[in-house]
Amino acid sequence: MSKERGLISPSDFAQLQKYMEYSTKKVSDVLKLFEDGEMAEYLQGDAIGYEGFQQFLKIYLEVDSVPSHLSLALFQSFQTSYCSEETVKRDVVCLSDVSCYFSLLEGGRPEDKLEFTFKLYDTDRNGILDSSEVDRIIIQMMRMAEYLDWDVSELRPILQEMMKEIDYDGSGSVSLAEWLRAGATTVPLLVLLGLEMTLKDNGQHMWRPKRFPRPVYCNLCESSIGLGKQGLSCNLCKYTVHDQCAMKALPCEVSTYAKSRKDIGVQTHVWVRGGCESGRCDRCQKKIRIYHSLVGLHCVWCHLEIHDDCLPAMGHECDCGLLRDHILPPSSIYPSVLASGQERKVSKTSQKTTDDLNLSTSEALRIDPVSNTHPLLVFVNPKSGGKQGERVLWKFQYLLNPRQVFNLLKDGPEPGLRFFREVPDYRILVCGGDGTVGWILETIDKANLPFVPPVAVLPLGTGNDLARCLRWGGGYEGQNLGKILKDLEASKVVHMDRWSVEVIPQQTEEKSDPVPFQIINNYFSIGVDASIAHRFHIMREKYPEKFNSRMKNKLWYFEFATSESIFSTCKKLEESLTVEICGKPLDLSNLSLEGIAVLNIPSTHGGSNLWGDTKRPHGDIHGINQALGAMAKVITDPDILKTCVPDLSDKRLEVVGLEGAIEMGQIYTKLKNAGHRLAKCSEITFHTTKTLPMQIDGEPWMQTPCTIKITHRNQMPMLVGPPPRSSNFFGFLC
């Protein structure tokens, strides 16, 4: 077997990661087979030979065979980097080294990956990287940059300067501490060395099957795909082909970031033939005859559509069109190693420390947004709203830079927040339900961001009470996303209150369900309302197919309310519950309640208003509420409560009493206006003496006797949509 030595190439590493994406096996699963299972025969002490290594890869990657060039390159890489002279002579590799490497790739901590790579290049095992070892690192970085299609002609001196900067004490060598410090703050070492591989713009189309309701022509063979027939369309550039033409298609034109200094700051048009859905030229305003052949051009960034003949009249520079306020053009994103030395020095003091290690592709790229714009960070939950989430995901990937759009099912919101961390004046759009919004807000809370961005909501699925209150509607129904983005551009910021919930259980043998959240964004309830929600939740978990529309949900809710009214599980609630508002007891003795709701926003259960409508007093409502709040932390006077309007930024909660399940069902189905207004306050405490149903933001649970304290936590900037346009002339007068 050849003893050619060398590190695994970037392309081989990319192929390895692709295999790992589709495998469900863990390293621990494979090790068991080698230690005491069917693969034990391949063990030679604590090492395995090439044949055993191939078996390891086949089992771990769940494939029938691994390309010989890949398995050989990996095997030789382990021999070069990790093994002693003895193991090299025996033509084996240490199984512990192999398992350690793949464990790190599975999801190891960044600091572990950094330490691992340090030892990989420290070939003489003296604990420092000398000049020859640093040169070896630079060579590997150059290979990686070439694989990523960066302009390598300008890169070598930059990398040499960067490696000098890592030598913080000027000793002429790099210690492990200096290596870890650099990787944790300013230098994307893992990406540059090929251990993080999501940077490649590889020219591959992101195909999705599409059935075309009107004549469309194949970008490759230029013949008709057929009316009502299915073809393939690229999510990123709208390049469209027959299924059988996809293998021969030209590479995707979309490059998501600048790969050379000369490309930074100047965005040019990227024209793709066809895709002119409007049928009208944005240059001459005449029709584009799209029904007869493959004609016209569209720009993937500004989305202008023009005749082929109008191209010479168009300038080279692209301003990103109507959505420029939201878009990060490729010219605004570039490898951080291409930043000047001064910029890197500044970022050393502004970015994270080794105590906050969480490296990813985001550290490899730097964002320098176009001035006077508000780049949009989009989070999409593809599971929300059936298939709506998936459609919204690929639509935004076309309308914006794909690097602005994050699939929450992949890695959650953290990668997106890290990527935008240093961007000024950006906004966030959350595409999902109230639960998804809560997840994003909680992550922002924990992220310790230098700038807390305002958050807008594109509601998917049912419910969506927060989106309703912020004027984004009760659910996305296929509206034009470009128009929604223009509405977002015109939105206003409101600082929404958020509340902490502390549940202190009493000593009891009963076991409580886990509390779903520690923060209230929408509402908290105890009693009949939560009991109905709990039944609804259990049934939906068992039979999700029965809860796939708003109308079905309303009917099911009404049915559960009816059955709850028969059993009255929360009757005489005041006998097992006491309430304190700002330290003062709330008198419930004259009321026959089966539930209490604490509201941060006026909408619950998909649009129900438990507080009810308020006759508008003369003057500014927000000002009146503030005046009332200034007079007293607690408002319980019924006459004053009649004039109080819910305000999600007044640091006050509305407390509502509910008589029973029938009343709750009537409110939910709009047959009754509201419950009983009990109080408006800034702090509330419940003491319970028996197990009761409770819910936070629509997530119910059964709670054993306890004390519950609700206090103000903070405020989060949220974006409120523009007011709805009036549908008649007289509406302008209101």
UniProtKB/Swiss-Prot annotation:
Pathway: Lipid metabolism; glycerolipid metabolism. Changing K483N: No significant effect on diacylglycerol kinase activity. It catalyses: a 1,2-diacyl-sn-glycerol + ATP = a 1,2-diacyl-sn-glycero-3-phosphate + ADP + H(+); a 1-O-alkyl-sn-glycerol + ATP = a 1-O-alkyl-sn-glycero-3-phosphate + ADP + H(+); 1-O-alkyl-2-acyl-sn-glycerol + ATP = 1-O-alkyl-2-acyl-sn-glycero-3-phosphate + ADP + H(+); 1,2-dihexadecanoyl-sn-glycerol + ATP = 1,2-dihexadecanoyl-sn-glycero-3-phosphate + ADP + H(+). The keyword Methyltransferase does not apply. Changing K492R: No significant effect on diacylglycerol kinase activity. Changing K395N: No significant effect on diacylglycerol kinase activity. GO terms for cellular component: cytosol; plasma membrane. Pfam families: C1_1, DAG_kinase_N, DAGK_acc, DAGK_cat, EF-hand_7. Residues 358-505 are annotated as: Necessary and sufficient for the diacylglycerol kinase activity. A zinc finger (Phorbol-ester/DAG-type) spans 204-252, 268-318. Residues 109-144, 154-189 form the EF-hand domain. Gene3D superfamilies: 2.60.200.40, 3.30.60.20, Diacylglycerol kinase alpha, EF-hand, Probable inorganic polyphosphate/atp-NAD kinase, domain 1. GO terms for biological process: diacylglycerol metabolic process; intracellular signal transduction; lipid phosphorylation; phosphatidic acid biosynthetic process; phospholipase C-activating G protein-coupled receptor signaling pathway. Ca(2+) 2 binds at D167, D169, S171, S173, E178. Ca(2+) 1 binds at D122, D124, N126, E133. Changing K248R: No significant effect on diacylglycerol kinase activity. The keyword Kinase applies. It comes from the Eukaryota. Residues 371-505 form the DAGKc domain. It is found in: Cytoplasm, Cytosol. Monomer. Diacylglycerol kinase that converts diacylglycerol/DAG into phosphatidic acid/phosphatidate/PA and regulates the respective levels of these two bioactive lipids. Thereby, acts as a central switch between the signaling pathways activated by these second messengers with different cellular targets and opposite effects in numerous biological processes. Also plays an important role in the biosynthesis of complex lipids. Can also phosphorylate 1-alkyl-2-acylglycerol in vitro as efficiently as diacylglycerol provided it contains an arachidonoyl group. PANTHER family: DIACYLGLYCEROL KINASE, DIACYLGLYCEROL KINASE ALPHA. Belongs to the eukaryotic diacylglycerol kinase family. This is Diacylglycerol kinase alpha.
